[in-house]
A protein has these predicted regions:
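Short, flexible loop/turn elements at secondary-structure junctions
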Residues: 12, 20-26, 64, 143
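Conserved flavin/dinucleotide-binding core of flavoenzymes
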Residues: 5-7, 24, 33, 54, ...
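Central beta-strand plus flanking loop segment that forms part of the substrate or channel wall
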Residues: 42-69
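Flavin (primarily FAD) binding-site architecture
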Residues: 19-42, 59
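Solvent-exposed residues in well-ordered beta-strands and their adjoining turns
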Residues: 11, 61-63, 102
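Phosphate/oxyanion-binding loops and surfaces in catalytic or ligand/nucleic-acid-binding neighborhoods
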Residues: 28, 65, 128
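Conserved beta-strand-loop-beta-strand element in the redox core of flavoprotein oxidoreductases
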Residues: 1-16
């Protein structure tokens, strides 16, 4: 008999059918799928055990690159945490200073109003540059901790989880194969996600 095809039914009513598929979405999204038949218990446990890092990027658009050095970066002990030049080696007098925070620092920056967040960021820069508010044109935010599809930025393997959990997550389920940055040796980067997709195909 011919092997059963994989049927994907979407929330908008669309249906797709294939001989085999590669599932490369984060484990949070995998948990939202109604699998029929259901996934093996061992795989479900592995999916639930994998955690994801909470990352926030808070770019500041500036009318002038007041930090001067194209290679500028800076670490602080404030919630704003880490800064780097987001428009490095790009032409123009304006620039983007990227504020990058993880964990509780990212949570705190993402949870406050835009004006308050700007104040926190500007205060973190003040010891090095003084008052830079006149240079600020706009500020933006993306917080992966509340991303509706991943609820995290990249997979965060706890102690021993790399060897305990990853092999189970990689195991195919019927005609569904799994890939993604969380299953890559170069884990946490899009290059790793791409390589894991190539590995799944082979």
């Amino acid at each position: 008999t011919a092997p059963k095809k994989v049927v994907i039914k979407c929330s908008n009513g669309s249906t797709f059918e294939a001989d085999k598929i590669i599932c490369s979405i984060p484990t949070f999204a995998i948990k939202q799928i109604q699998w029929n038949p259901i996934l093996p218990t061992q795989k479900i446990d592995a999916i639930h055990s994998l955690q994801y890092a909470r990352i926030g990027k808070f770019p500041i658009v500036c009318t002038e690159r007041f930090w001067k050095d194209e290679n500028f970066d800076m670490v602080t002990d404030t919630p704003a945490h880490y800064f780097y030049h987001g428009t490095k080696n790009q032409p123009g007098s304006q620039g983007v200073l990227m504020c990058y925070a993880i964990g509780e620092k990212a949570d705190s920056l993402a949870s406050v109003h835009k004006n308050q967040r700007e104040e926190i960021i500007l205060n973190a820069l003040k010891p090095a540059f003084g008052n830079v508010k006149p240079f600020i044109k706009n500020s933006l935010m993306y917080y992966w901790g509340t991303d509706p599809f991943s609820y995290g930025a990249y997979a965060f393997y706890g102690k021993d989880k790399w060897f305990e959990v990853m092999p189970t997550l990689k195991q195919a389920f019927m005609n569904t194969h799994f890939a993604g940055e969380h299953l890559a040796d170069w884990q946490g980067f899009m290059e790793g996600a791409l390589q894991s997709g190539l590995d799944a195909v082979s």
